[in-house]
Amino acid sequence: MAETTAPKPRVLVADDEQVIANTLAIILNQAGFEARAVFSGEKAVEMLESFEPDMLISDVIMTGMTGIEAAIITRERRPSCKVLLFSGQAATADLLEKARAQGHEFEILAKPVHPTDLLAKLRG
């Protein structure tokens, strides 16, 4: 009898700092996830249909579309997709408050995110 393995959870990582996005994707791939890195909120939204992520991990402050805007669109288009945001910017609080006022709640991690903490969140 052939043994079937469960598909790897798909994680889309969005950060306009390419080194951070790529590094997180490498860490996640090595930890047993199928991860892809994109470098803008717009690209994250574009990838929703073709990659079909189980989770979006996004920086909040990015050039163009913010991570919060991408997260809201992600939840609208893929309601089962979990969202985790991270940021090292103080301005994040204002953006989160605006999203909260519109009925959107997001979990946020402080940047830099230690890989152990990130993996614990993803597996928890």
Q: Where would I find each of the regions flagged by the language model?
A:
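Non-catalytic signal-transmission and effector/linker regions of two-component phosphorelay proteins
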Residues: 1-12, 114-124
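The short loop immediately C-terminal to the conserved phospho-acceptor aspartate in CheY-like receiver
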Residues: 17, 60-61
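The feature encodes the CheY-like receiver
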Residues: 21, 63
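Charged docking surfaces used in two-component/phosphorelay signaling
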Residues: 22-30
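Short hydrophobic/Thr-rich beta-strand motif most characteristic of the beta2 strand and flanking loop
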Residues: 32-39, 47, 109
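Acidic catalytic/metal-coordinating carboxylates
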Residues: 39-43, 66-70
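Active-site beta3 strand of CheY-like receiver
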Residues: 51-57, 84
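Hydrophobic/aromatic residues positioned on beta-strands within the core alpha/beta folds
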Residues: 86-88
